[in-house]
Amino acid sequence: HWNGQGLLASDFGGVRVRHLLLVRMIERLQPKSVLEVGCGLGIHLILLACRFPHIAFAGVELTDAGYSAARALQRQERLPEHLIGYAPGPLQDPTAFRRIDFRQGNAAALQFADGSFDLVYSVLALEQMERVRARALAEIARVTRRHYFGIEPFRDVNDRGWERAYVRGRDYLRGRIDDLPRYGLVPEFASSDFPQERFLKACAVLAEKRT
C-alpha cells in the first residue's frame, strides 16, 4: 500500500524497497563502519558490502539458522546470481561480502566496544525483540558513534484504523519514535512514505547519537 493505492507485490519487492532505503542512507551519511542488528540471513549486509566495498560491515544474528545461513553464503567465492537480482543498483565488488564480520549474538548484549560503528541499523528486527527492546536500543546507542537508522513498525505510524487494531490485537511492538531520545538517540528524519504492507506499516527513522 502506498500513496493511497493498493499495490500487489511479493516479499521480493518489499526487500528491494527496504534495501534501496539503506543504500540511500549510506550514500547520505558516508559511514566508514556499519553494523546491522538482527541481520537474519544477511541479505542486506551482503549486498551493501558489495556495493560499498570500502566500508567495514558487521552483523549480529541471534538464531542458529540465520547465522549459519549467512556464514555458509559467505564461504562462497562469489555472490550467487540469484541474489544479485535483489540489488537496486550496480555492485562494485561481488566478492566484498566475504569480508563481513558476521557474529552470532544477542542484541541486548552486543559484543562490541563503545562507539565501534559510525552507523548501526535494523530492518524489521526490533519488532521481534519486544521483551528486550529497551536493552537492545541501549546497546545500539552504546556501540554507535554517530547514527542509528531503523526501518521498523513503530507505534507512531500504526495508531489508526486497521494498523491500530492489528498491533493492539497482537500486542505487537510498543516502541515509539518518541521513545528514542531516552536512549540518547535523537530523531532527525522519519518517513513511512514508501510501498509496504497494508496492515503493518514500517517507518524509516534516522536518529543521531547525542550524549
Locate each region found by the language model.
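Class I SAM-dependent methyltransferase Rossmann-like catalytic core
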Residues: H1-V17
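Conserved alpha-helix/loop element of class I SAM-dependent methyltransferases that forms part
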Residues: G13-Q30
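Conserved glycine-rich SAM-binding loop
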Residues: G40
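Class I SAM-dependent methyltransferase SAM/SAH-binding core
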Residues: I43, L47, R51, I55-D101, ...
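A conserved beta-strand element that flanks and buttresses the S-adenosyl-L-methionine
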Residues: Y121
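A short, conserved alpha-helix within the catalytic core of class I
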Residues: Q128-E139
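Conserved beta-strand signature within the Rossmann-like core of class I S-adenosyl-L-methionine
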Residues: R145-D156
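Short alpha-helix
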Residues: V167-P187
